[in-house]
Amino acid sequence: MKMPLMMRMHRDFPPNAKVKQIGISCSHRKYFVSFSVEYEQDITIIKNPKNGVGLDLNVCDIACSCDINHHDKLTDFKQYQTDMKELLGIEIDEEVNTKRLIPTYSKLHSFKKYSKEYKRLQRKQSRRVLKSKQNKTKLGGNFYKTQKKLNQVFDKSSHQKTDRYHKITSELSKQFELIVVEDLQVKNMTKRAKLKNVKQKSGLNKAILNTSFYQIISFLDYKQQHNGKLLVKVPPQYTSKTCHCCGNINHKLKLNHRQYWCLECGYREHRDINAANNILSKGLSLRAGNVHARL
């Protein structure tokens, strides 16, 4: 029996689009319909290759090689500084050029998922499951009520993060014809530490996985293609340790050093912004046929 169903559309189809495939998915008793459509899009050659930006993806923020227009749309940076300090105890340097940093809020979203209340309910659920197995009884109604609360918190946090990444990537794709990112190998970045600092490394691994670098890059990839623009991936080696001015590599630079200071030429800059400048330079040199290119 065929029956009409009410649904809420996220956005209209592109003009002259043909629906090729329909997919139905269910997540925690919520149903979603996705449409695969085919339509024509004019792809124009990049007019101004210098209108590019290098992005250094980090756990707390995305560093850009140049200022971002309409930066206030993407974040309230003062509120971000307050939230990070009060909730996580992380202090953000006020002297940094904030128009080159876009907070991801990934730590704040994961904080909601792993808050004390959330963990308490998870432990409660585990005890209920263990008790039902020992007594060979069915799980009661309270178990499913609590699980529904946990699912709602997890879904809300996940949707907030995805929505934020969509807003960031859409604004970047709208402003820049060329976007250069690092070709990050998250699997290698999140390998377990050997012998020393195992606990510290596990915390860093969790933060990296919560940030979802691949999701950001995949959003940028398809949006750049849709807009007829270009996304370039470059090797990530020594982007943070190399001086953008003279090219000297500071091998003594550690992860907790947030300010880059070149011992050769005296150049000083925020560590991630220096890395973003190097990433853009690498991308421009690749497009120029491995010829050294600088801004």
Description of each model-found segment:
Residues M1-K2, F35:
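Short, hydrophobic/proline-enriched secondary-structure or compact coil segments at domain edges
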Residues P15-L295:
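Positively charged, helix-rich recognition surfaces that bind polyanionic ligands
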